[in-house]
């Protein structure tokens, strides 16, 4: 395809309607037709990236292969498309302004007054088109964060308006809105959608396709009414009804020919409808599964639905791969202790100790780990979860009562987890951790090696602290083996206790490398061990 096509996904009425899922689903449909597709997210906040944002504020922080801390929607894009993203796939207002200000300081604007239009909008447009020009994608789908009408989003909306004018048929806008159902009146209300589209039109954009989020199926009369009042073709009004799983959304859109409508509007040949066989097989396995596997997730942000999004989805994918339904139980680590851990965790087939930062809730993780170790419950520790495995083992097996991480207690006698050498002179918090994909060599015969089926793997990281190798011999002599390490630095990446059924801690984040068609092998192995433990 000669020219890259650009599709913008905007949202109206309320936030959290699922623009990211719609963008990912549309991308999946186009990819299934043989097109090379990528998806990017523009976030209107002024932070450079979400790396320093509290999970309560923003949910999970996702990490790309090239080490960018990104919005959790990039996780959806990767899980749906099975294609890695980079820092170019997530742009914030902060990065746009930072780039423009740096150019102004260097004199790139030759003394011009730097303004939102054209300088900020030009920088936004440059970032929109970068992926298409650099990587030769057929389609670049751009999700605009926030809701139409938000003051923060205005420069992005203006940039979309300009691009629609400049790119002509190679550009279109998909607008997602909400159609509420008023139970007392027993009717749907389309007025919020009409006003949302009107707002978009006032900003110079006529949407080409409308996606209506709704809890119940809408009648043809309602969709025709929306088409009439919003200046949209009747076949370009698509419903996105609530479904049991987000992975059904591509099929919901496909049944309404959303991909066909978009291809026709862009002057492209439609061709036969793709089967999407692997996707359908995944959903069929999910539907057919009758037995369940109970996994307990121990973390300190469990009350927020999106805080461990990639872990949740990785567990689901691994459970389906093993022909099981996932029964996920969330345990707040601040509410766990040695006195209640056995009672609260006794029904779990497996335990996952979540990543995180800081002292709060860490004693509850130690209690869960001690229970799992003493009762031989399959257990996976990720990042801080792995570090907690090391600390608990040092305290309760090696007799180092004061063992700790220098993150929690800088003056601890036994620094079994310590700040990485290259982190000791770092002063800025943002974007300064060990980030992105790194190599790891696994010890043959280890649980991790058996899971991956190979010696050399690559997984993504997000941490400042590491296992202190000064204690390695003591741990190995006492039964906790270091079975994975970075080939260049010797940094310990994997620890496990071979005497137990399945007890593995990893410094990396395997959840960032798990998709619908390729679930992460470590999660698959962990869930299999939990099933065998029933």
Residue ranges of predicted features:
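Flexible phosphate-sensing "switch/lid" loops adjacent to ATP/NTP-binding sites
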Residues: 1-327, 334-350, 357-358, 365-371, ...
């Amino acid at each position: 395809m000669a020219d890259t096509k650009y599709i913008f996904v905007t949202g109206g009425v309320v936030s959290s309607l699922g623009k990211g899922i719609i963008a990912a689903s549309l991308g999946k449909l186009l990819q299934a037709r043989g097109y090379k597709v990528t998806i990017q997210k523009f976030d209107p906040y002024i932070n450079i990236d979400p790396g320093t944002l509290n999970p309560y504020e923003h949910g999970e922080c996702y990490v790309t292969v090239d080490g960018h801390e990104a919005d959790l929607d990039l996780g959806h894009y990767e899980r749906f498309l099975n294609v890695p993203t980079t820092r170019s796939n997530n742009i914030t207002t902060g990065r746009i302004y930072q780039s423009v200000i740096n150019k102004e300081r260097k004199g790139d604007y030759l003394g011009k007054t730097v303004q939102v239009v054209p300088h900020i909008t030009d920088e936004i447009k440059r970032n929109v088109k970068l992926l298409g020009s650099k990587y030769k994608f057929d389609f670049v789908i751009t999700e605009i964060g926030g809701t139409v009408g938000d003051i923060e989003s205005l420069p992005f909306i203006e940039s979309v308006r300009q691009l629609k004018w400049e790119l002509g048929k190679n550009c279109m806008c998909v607008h997602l809105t909400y159609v509420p159902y008023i139970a007392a009146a027993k009717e749907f209300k389309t007025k919020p959608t009409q006003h949302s589209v009107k707002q978009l039109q006032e900003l110079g954009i006529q949407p080409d396709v409308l996606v209506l989020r709704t809890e119940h199926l809408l009648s043809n009369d309602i969709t025709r009414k929306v088409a009439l009042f919003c200046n949209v073709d009747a076949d370009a009004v698509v419903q996105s009804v609530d479904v049991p799983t987000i992975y059904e959304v591509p099929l919901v859109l496909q049944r309404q020919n959303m991909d066909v409508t978009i291809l026709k509007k862009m002057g492209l040949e439609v061709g036969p409808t793709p089967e999407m066989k692997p996707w359908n097989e995944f959903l069929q396995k999910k539907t057919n599964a009758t037995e369940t596997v109970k996994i307990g997730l121990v973390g300190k942000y469990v009350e927020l639905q999106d805080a461990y999004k990639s872990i949740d989805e990785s567990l689901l994918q691994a459970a389906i791969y093993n022909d099981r339904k996932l029964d996920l139980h969330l345990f707040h680590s601040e509410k766990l202790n040695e006195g209640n851990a056995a009672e609260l965790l006794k029904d779990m087939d497996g335990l996952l100790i979540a990543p995180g930062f800081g002292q709060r809730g860490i004693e509850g993780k130690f209690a869960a780990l001690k229970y799992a170790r003493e009762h031989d419950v399959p257990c996976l520790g990720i990042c801080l979860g792995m570090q907690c495995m090391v600390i608990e083992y040092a305290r309760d097996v090696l007799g180092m009562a004061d063992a700790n991480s220098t993150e929690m207690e800088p003056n601890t006698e036994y620094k079994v987890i310590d700040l990485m050498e290259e982190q000791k002179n770092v002063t800025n918090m943002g974007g300064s951790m060990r980030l992105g994909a790194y190599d790891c060599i696994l010890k043959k015969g280890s649980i991790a090696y058996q899971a991956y089926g190979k010696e050399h793997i690559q997984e993504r990281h997000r941490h400042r602290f590491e296992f202190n190798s000064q204690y390695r011999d003591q741990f190995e002599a006492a039964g906790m083996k270091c079975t994975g390490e970075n080939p260049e630095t010797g940094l310990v990446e994997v620890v496990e206790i071979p005497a137990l059924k399945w007890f593995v801690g990893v410094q990396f984040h395997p959840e960032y490398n798990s998709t619908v068609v390729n679930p992460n092998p470590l999660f698959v192995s962990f869930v299999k061990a939990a099933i065998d433990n029933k």
